[in-house]
Structures are given as C-alpha cells and as structure tokens.
C-alpha cells in the first residue's frame, strides 16, 4: 500500500549514491567542511522515483548566531537561569570571525563543482543553491548543497549540538545565504514521534506523498508541508489505530485545514520555526489533496474497511 516504506535495497542504493559523492569530495581535497545528509531518506519517508538525497557540505570555519535575540535576553534577564545566561554570554564573548564568510562558501561551491564535474557525466551546475548529479550506475540523483552553521537561542542553550543547529544555504548567483533551516531537528522529531507511535506518523506522510504524485492535478505543496500536516496531528488520535484507519485520520486533518482557517493558521513546521498556512494560498492546494484523499476514504468506507 502507499503507506509502506521503500524496500531496503532501494534505500541502500540512494544512500550509497550520496556516500560516493562525499568520497569524491573528500578525495578531491575539499577542506574545512563537514558532511551531513538531509531530506526524506533520513526519515524513511521517501517514495520511489520522487526522492533524491541531499548532501550538505557545511563550512567549519565560522558560524553565525541569532545576535538580536541573544542580546535582548541578556538585556532583560527574564525567564532564563544564570547557567543559561552564562552560555549566551560565552557566545557573545567569542572573537568574531575575521575571514570572508561568503567567499569561503563560494570556494566550497566552486571547488565542489570542479571535483564533481569530472566524476559524473550528468552534473548540472546551473542551479543557484545546489549541484545536481546523477549516478547512472545506481540510478540515483544527489543534490550537493554548500551551507554554513546557524545557532538560535535553543541551539546555544543545547551546546550547539547538531540536532539543534540550523544551516544557511549558499546561493552562488546572489552570492548570499538563505534564512536558517533546521533539517536535523525535523529529522530527529519525525523519527522520534514515529517510533513512539509504531511507525504510524511515517505511514501517514508516505501516504500523502503518494497521493500527491499520483494525483491527476498538480498540487503545489512540498514534502516540508506534508511533514507538518501529519506531525501536527496529536498522537492520541492515531497511536493505537490499524493502519487503514490512518486514512480517516489524514482525511479529518485535511478537512480541518481546508474548512477551518483558524485551525490551519496554527499549524507549524516540524521544527516549530514557521507557520505553514498563515499568509499564503497553500490551502487552495490542500483542497486538491483533500479531494483525492476523500475519494480513497470513500472507497474504503464503501467496502466496510473503515
């Protein structure tokens, strides 16, 4: 069924494609970087033919942090312990990076391009934020993304441990960095909640992804949005349900998003950093997805499977 995980062999080849890119960059002499993966493969919510793997190449020379909020907290000293405040003061007191951070990121991007261009017949260098290669032996795509570390208050208070750290992606055309993303926090949260619910969260995510790609309509929502839609369903609503019954749970969630704007506006991303539906037209797209799920739900009801 559309909720099932992709088979281990398929997933293994996807990860191997990412590892081969990493090995090429390591052997090519790229320095002062660390490598991390992001995306649906890391949560086992990927679907066949529609999911690649992202290899993050993160500069280790510098990081940035949320100076505005840190300074505000230190000025007001409200709701934080002395121990927490000392961590924030330590960050502020560190010597600032004296190099050119954008030039460092540009070097990572261009050196990565030079290494990979000679390793892959299909190597697309035109995208501002990613190098896109195809491993023709494994039949897998890999996106290679240059980025830097970003620490908000939560990350600093958690000792800049990777699950809490954000990243800022480098754009070679604009020669700047994006607003922070928190892929590792999202990965950890999805994996943890799904483990605590017997894999049901991931089944719902896969189900919606498959409905989207199989739809006759073009549905303009991302995996990021689908993750949030499912993650925001309270676990007590599905924790002990049979897997087929998850269709009704997802149907009810989409119904509320489509017909209750106030409810939709409260849905936040898995990392808790942004609202998914507030101030945009995504609910129009969700209605298309809802209609497809309603069709499946109705069939299951007619067949007395729900």
Question: What do these predicted ranges mean?
Answer:
Residues 55, 68-70, 159:
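Residue-level signature of transmembrane alpha-helix interfaces in integral membrane proteins
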Residues 33-34, 129-131, 226, 265-268:
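Residue-level recognition of the N-termini of beta-strands and the immediately preceding loop/turn
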Residues 13-19, 88-260, 301-304:
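Catalytic cores of NTP-dependent nucleotidyl/adenyl transfer enzymes across multiple folds
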């Amino acid at each position: 069924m559309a909720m099932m995980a992709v088979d281990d062999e398929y997933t293994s080849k996807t990860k191997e494609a990412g590892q081969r890119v990493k090995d090429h960059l390591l052997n090519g002499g790229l320095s002062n970087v660390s490598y991390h993966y992001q995306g649906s493969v890391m949560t086992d919510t990927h679907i066949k033919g529609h999911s690649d793997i992202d290899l993050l190449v993160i500069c280790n020379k510098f990081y940035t942090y949320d100076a505005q909020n840190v300074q505000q907290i230190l000025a007001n000293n409200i709701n934080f312990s002395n121990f927490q405040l000392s961590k924030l003061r330590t960050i502020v007191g560190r010597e600032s990076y004296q190099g050119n951070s954008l030039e460092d990121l540009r070097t990572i991007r261009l050196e990565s391009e030079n290494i990979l261009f000679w390793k892959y017949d299909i190597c697309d260098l035109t995208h501002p934020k990613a190098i896109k290669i195809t491993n023709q032996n494994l039949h897998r795509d890999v996106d290679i993304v240059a980025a830097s570390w970003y620490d908000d208050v939560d990350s600093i208070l958690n000792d800049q441990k990777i699950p809490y750290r954000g990243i800022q992606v480098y754009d070679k055309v604009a020669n700047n960095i994006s607003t922070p993303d928190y892929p590792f926090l999202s990965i950890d949260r999805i994996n943890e909640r799904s483990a605590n619910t017997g894999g049901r969260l991931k089944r719902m995510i896969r189900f919606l992804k498959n409905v989207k790609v199989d739809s006759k309509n073009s549905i303009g929502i991302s995996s990021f949005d689908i993750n949030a839609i499912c993650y925001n369903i309270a676990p007590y609503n599905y924790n002990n349900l049979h897997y087929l019954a998850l269709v009704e749970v997802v149907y009810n969630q989409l119904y509320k998003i489509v017909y209750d704007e106030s409810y939709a506006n409260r849905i936040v991303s898995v990392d808790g950093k942004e609202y998914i539906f507030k101030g945009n037209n995504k609910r129009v797209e969700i209605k298309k997805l809802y209609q497809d799920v309603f069709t499946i739900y109705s069939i299951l009801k007619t067949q007395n499977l729900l």
